[in-house]
Swiss-Prot record:
Pathway note: Nucleotide-sugar biosynthesis; GDP-alpha-D-mannose biosynthesis; alpha-D-mannose 1-phosphate from D-fructose 6-phosphate: step 2/2
Organism: Encephalitozoon cuniculi (strain GB-M1) (Microsporidian parasite)
Top-level lineage group: Eukaryota
Taxonomy of the source species: Eukaryota, Fungi, Fungi incertae sedis, Microsporidia, Unikaryonidae
GO molecular-function terms, A-Z: metal ion binding; phosphomannomutase activity
GO biological process: GDP-mannose biosynthetic process; mannose metabolic process; protein N-linked glycosylation
Family annotation (InterPro entries): HAD-like_sf, HAD-SF_hydro_IIB, HAD_sf, PMM, PMM_cap
UniProt-recorded name of the protein: Phosphomannomutase
Broad enzyme group: isomerase
Residues at which alpha-D-mannose 1-phosphate binds: 21, 123, 134, 141, 179, 181
Entry's EC annotation: 5.4.2.8
Sorted UniProt keywords: Cytoplasm, Isomerase, Magnesium, Metal-binding
Signal peptide positions (record): none
Subcellular location: Cytoplasm
Annotated function: Involved in the synthesis of the GDP-mannose and dolichol-phosphate-mannose required for a number of critical mannosyl transfer reactions.
Length: 256
């Protein structure tokens, strides 16, 4: 059966193809290899390409037809960088300084059992904020994640930032287990759709884990031009990819 060039299966990385900040299982690599024979495939995530390589592999751009690091602000096609933009060109240095100062003051007042380093991470597409600090260990990450479910540290901080910067272009969403994504309106994961539309794709299937309101998959999951599929972990992603293929008449993952 010839590949359906009108259809793309688009994947979040963290929590979807791999467990949070962990290596992608070999099973998922084989899934992508099988899937690519049936439809176009792409990945989209808020992290930069270096972090996505840590999880998927150094050959990530060879595995996928399309790569959308930093929500598609960086756009790769067949392994080649096609375009890239920078958030600082939108925000300006003065606003960014004001924003960073507010964030650092706010974080200094949060009482956590432990704090590590890298509380603000500047990326081309967003500012990523972590109350515990992105340098925390995996064990510390999980402890913060469980504590945050009860204490709502990130939810409260998002509310404070929305109030303080309500007249700005910034949007705030809870990302992954330890952080908050801050980006210009429209620079969420739906940003990648502007590139996909130019590729002759008619059917977009998106798989992501943070699809709840306030999660960083919410906007693309609910976009009118996207078939959004919510997943709980890589094993769930595998099952739902298989189900989606059968539903659109392309056979399951093992049927090549």
């Amino acid at each position: 059966m010839a590949r359906d060039e009108k259809t793309i299966f688009l994947f979040d990385v963290d929590g979807t193809l791999s467990e949070s900040r962990a290596k992608m299982p070999e099973k998922m690599g084989k899934m992508l290899e099988s899937l690519r024979r049936k439809v176009r495939i792409g990945f989209v995530g808020g992290s930069d390409l270096a972090k996505q390589k840590e999880q998927v592999g150094d050959n990530i751009l060879e595995i996928f037809d399309y790569g959308f690091p930093e929500n598609g602000v960086s756009f790769y096609k067949n392994g080649t960088l096609e375009s890239q933009e920078k958030i600082i060109d939108v925000l300006g240095e003065e606003f960014y300084k004001e924003f960073a100062n507010f964030v650092l003051r706010y974080l200094s007042d949060i009482d956590l059992p432990i704090k590590r380093g890298n509380f603000i991470e500047y990326r081309n597409s967003m500012i990523n904020i972590s109350p515990i600090g992105r340098n925390c260990s995996r064990e510390e990450r999980m402890k913060f994640f469980e504590l945050d479910k009860k204490e709502k540290f990130r939810e409260k901080m998002v509310t404070a930032m929305r109030d303080r910067f309500k007249d700005s272009c910034l949007v705030f969403s809870i990302g992954g287990q330890i952080s908050i994504d801050c980006f210009p309106k429209g620079w969420d994961k739906t940003y990648c759709l502007r590139h996909i539309k130019k590729e002759g794709v008619e059917n977009v299937y998106f798989f992501g884990d943070m699809t709840m309101e306030g999660g960083n998959d919410y906007e693309i999951y609910n976009h009118k031009d996207v078939h959004g599929i919510s997943v709980g972990n890589p094993d769930d992603t595998y099952r739902k990819v298989d189900q989606a293929l059968k539903k659109i008449g392309l056979g399951g993952l093992e049927e090549n």
